[in-house]
Amino acid sequence: MFNYVTMSKKVYIGCGAGFAGDRYDASIPIVEDFKSINEPKYLMFEVLAERTLAIAQQYRINDDTKGYSPYLDYYIKPVLEDCLEHKIKIISNMGAANPLGAAKRLSLIHISEPTRHCT
């Protein structure tokens, strides 16, 4: 049986965005703080609401390569290298109506951006 009273491990969660088009640099100081922490770390970008999803679906209907957050690059590029190096997991709903498209775009960002460390 697991004893929750003696559990000492902490989990750190930071929020880099709270709505579509939120500040693109908000995650940078969070990641800087996370770099020195040796516990599980998660960086969240919450950018989706009902209206945002409806707009994303319209984009995807018109072009099946679209439908994910048009801001994905702006949020991810400034912190991707440090997140990879310091094992900070990124959680987001930037995939909107096209999560596979967002994953492909993220892969392209990762391949095209020079990084010091890849996991």
Regions found by a protein language model. Give the residues of each.
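N-terminal amphipathic/basic leader segments beginning at the initiator methionine
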Residues: 2-31
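Gly-rich Lys/Arg/Thr-decorated short loops/hinges at beta-loop-alpha junctions or inter-strand turns
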Residues: 5-12, 50-66, 83-86
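Structural motif
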Residues: 10-14, 40-44, 88-91
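Gly/Ser/Thr-rich loops at beta-strand to alpha-helix junctions
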Residues: 19-21, 49-51, 94-103
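Short acidic, glycine/serine/threonine-rich loops at helix termini
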Residues: 25-27, 53-58, 101-106
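N-terminal glycine-rich anion-binding loops that anchor highly charged ligand groups
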Residues: 38-56
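Class I S-adenosyl-L-methionine
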Residues: 64-76
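Single conserved hydrophobic/aromatic residue that forms the stacking wall/gate
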Residues: 109-119
